[in-house]
Amino acid sequence: MFTLKKPLLVLFFLATINLSLCEQERNAEEERRDDDERNVEVEKRFFPIVGKLLSGLFGK
């Protein structure tokens, strides 16, 4: 019985480490993706404001 427990324990340990590493990588990828989305949102907010200011300065 002990001969079966030891390999199963090792497999469980390795799987836990693997899942932990995958989770860290996924979190890092989500953070990078969030930064890109924020940059797009800032651009979307910035361009209409600049357009309104320029149209106000030059008049239509």
Swiss-Prot record:
Residues of the signal peptide: 1-22
Tissue expression pattern: Expressed by the skin glands.
GO BP annotations, alphabetical order: defense response to bacterium; defense response to fungus; killing of cells of another organism
A Pfam family matched in the record: FSAP_sig_propep
GO cellular component: extracellular region
Superkingdom field: Eukaryota
Propiece residues: 23-43
Disulfide bonds: none
Main localization (coarse): secreted
Subcellular location: Secreted
UniProt keywords, alphabetically: Amphibian defense peptide, Antibiotic, Antimicrobial, Cleavage on pair of basic residues, Cytolysis, Fungicide, Hemolysis, Secreted, Signal
UniProt similarity note: Belongs to the frog skin active peptide (FSAP) family. Temporin subfamily.
Functional description taken from the UniProt entry: Antimicrobial peptide active against a variety of Gram-positive bacterial strains but not against Gram-negative bacteria. Has weak antifungal activity against a slime mold isolate. Has weak hemolytic activity against human erythrocytes.
Protein name: Temporin-CG2
